[in-house]
């Protein structure tokens, strides 16, 4: 049967679903472009699709925000056609053995902060920040982190007067308990600070592999939420972040000290992450862990680990990153030597070129530009999303209620161009 939506899109197979409805892979009949088609029963008790489609239109044009191509009604369904995206960060986290390297955490955190700042600048809070709601792009935008699922989002201030919503208590928990802020657990109305506290927990989840309040047993959902809240309150931030750079504890402490109506200092938070990045000597080359793992798994049998043991894969990732750092240190030493040589040989004829200096420019320009970004102003709607990348698709989210927009397939992760070293613009 040839099912068509809006006279323009053809529905093919189901790629996801949950309590909200179902998601199908679709195709633009005219261009053959693949899209995601989300269907919600028109008689849903708590319909969200119309509201969500309006938010996507408000956020339209933002970096890392999928575009809505069509919204309408057909028979018993509300229907939204959107950009097709790649795997979620939760999918990729599982693919990499449920632990990310510090470099990957910092590159992701930088983009995730900018996505949250963008929706806050448009007067909304997300209220469900978690790995499942961040999806990588596909094709040439495979290195771009996308924020999705605005069904629980809420306007926190008037768009004209910027009057903040009032402080309230005794609210039900909205979002995902694992990543919810302490104030959310305690029934306090959410505001901008809560999105950022949730992001802090997500980053530590990526660092640690799990959070201390996971796996708690309870007979009812209410009891489980209470146990998670108690464990979260009892776990000191320094304990949660032990063994990792102190900036992660600083990040979480900052979010917890924010007041209800406070505007978060995103520049300060990004600077925390970026200073770590520079201190570790990383290059912003979009070489995420899943790119390295994919390359390792594609090696001939004699070159790759004897099994898919996650520890072996993590060791391989660390070895490759150490090798990259050593190469960078050598380049910096050569640059220093070149500077000395240039100073002592300034009396050379003008037609004599210092070949060493010329050859080192390409290896140092990117890092210098990246350091300059530490002092750049707060968010503007510009991103370095032109890095050529090749990506395909992956399995559906581990959360059955998660809105995901990608093909249900075997795990095939995005590739990245190893020659791309351009840092993200602010």
Curated annotation (Swiss-Prot):
Region: Disordered, residue numbers: 340-360, 377-426
The annotated regions of Low complexity compositional bias extend over 386-404
Entry PTM: Autophosphorylated.
Instruction: Extract the InterPro entries matched here.
Output: CK1_Ser-Thr_kinase, Kinase-like_dom_sf, Prot_kinase_dom, Protein_kinase_ATP_BS, Ser/Thr_kinase_AS
Which keywords does this chain's UniProt record carry?
Answer: ATP-binding, Cytoplasm, Kinase, Nucleotide-binding, Nucleus, Phosphoprotein, Serine/threonine-protein kinase, Transferase
Q: Which reaction does it catalyse?
A: L-seryl-[protein] + ATP = O-phospho-L-seryl-[protein] + ADP + H(+); L-threonyl-[protein] + ATP = O-phospho-L-threonyl-[protein] + ADP + H(+)
Function, as annotated: Casein kinases are operationally defined by their preferential utilization of acidic proteins such as caseins as substrates. Can phosphorylate a large number of proteins. May have a role in DNA repair mechanism and support vegetative growth of the cells.
| Assembly with partners or alone | Monomer.
Can you say what this protein is called? Casein kinase I
The organism encoding this protein is Dictyostelium discoideum (Social amoeba)
Q: Which gene encodes it?
A: cak1-1
């Amino acid at each position: 049967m040839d099912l068509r939506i809006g006279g323009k899109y053809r529905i093919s197979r189901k790629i996801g679903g949950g309590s909200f409805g179902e998601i199908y892979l679709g195709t633009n009949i005219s261009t053959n472009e693949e899209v995601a088609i989300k269907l919600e029963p028109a008689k849903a008790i708590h319909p969200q699709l119309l509201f969500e489609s309006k938010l996507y239109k408000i956020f339209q044009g933002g970096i890392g925000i999928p575009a809505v191509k069509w919204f309408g009604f057909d028979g018993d369904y509300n229907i939204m056609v959107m950009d097709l995206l790649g795997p979620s960060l939760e999918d990729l986290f599982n693919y990499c053995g449920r632990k990310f390297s510090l470099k990957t955490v910092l590159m992701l955190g930088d983009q995730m902060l900018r996505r949250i700042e963008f929706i806050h600048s448009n007067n909304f809070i997300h209220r469900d920040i978690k790995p499942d709601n961040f999806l990588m792009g596909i094709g040439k935008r495979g290195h771009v982190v996308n924020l999705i699922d605005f069904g629980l989002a809420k306007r926190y201030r008037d768009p004209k007067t910027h009057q903040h919503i009032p402080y309230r208590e005794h609210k039900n928990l909205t979002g995902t308990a694992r990543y919810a802020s302490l104030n959310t657990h305690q029934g306090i109305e959410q505001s901008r600070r809560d999105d950022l506290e949730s992001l802090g927990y997500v980053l530590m989840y990526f660092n640690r592999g799990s959070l201390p309040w996971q796996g708690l047993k309870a007979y009812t959902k209410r009891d489980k939420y209470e146990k998670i809240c108690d464990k979260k309150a009892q776990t000191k931030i320094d304990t949660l972040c032990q063994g990792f750079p102190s900036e992660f504890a600083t990040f979480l402490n900052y979010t917890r000290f924010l007041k209800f109506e406070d505007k978060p200092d995103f520049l300060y938070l990004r600077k925390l992450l970026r200073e770590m990045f520079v201190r570790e000597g990383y290059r912003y080359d979009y070489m995420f862990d899943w790119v390295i793992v994919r390359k390792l798994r594609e090696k001939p049998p004699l070159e790759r680990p004897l099994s898919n043991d996650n520890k072996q894969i993590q060791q391989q990732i660390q070895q490759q990153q150490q090798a990259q750092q050593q190469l960078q240190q050598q380049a910096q030493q050569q640059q220093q030597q070149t500077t000395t040589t240039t100073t002592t040989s300034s009396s050379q004829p003008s037609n004599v070129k210092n070949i060493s200096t010329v050859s080192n420019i390409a290896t140092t320009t990117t890092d210098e530009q990246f350091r300059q970004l530490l002092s750049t102003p707060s968010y503007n709607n510009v991103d370095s999303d032109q890095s050529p990348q090749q990506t395909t698709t992956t399995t559906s989210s581990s959360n059955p209620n998660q809105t995901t927009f990608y093909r249900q397939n075997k795990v095939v992760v995005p590739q990245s161009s190893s020659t791309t070293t351009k840092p993200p613009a602010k």
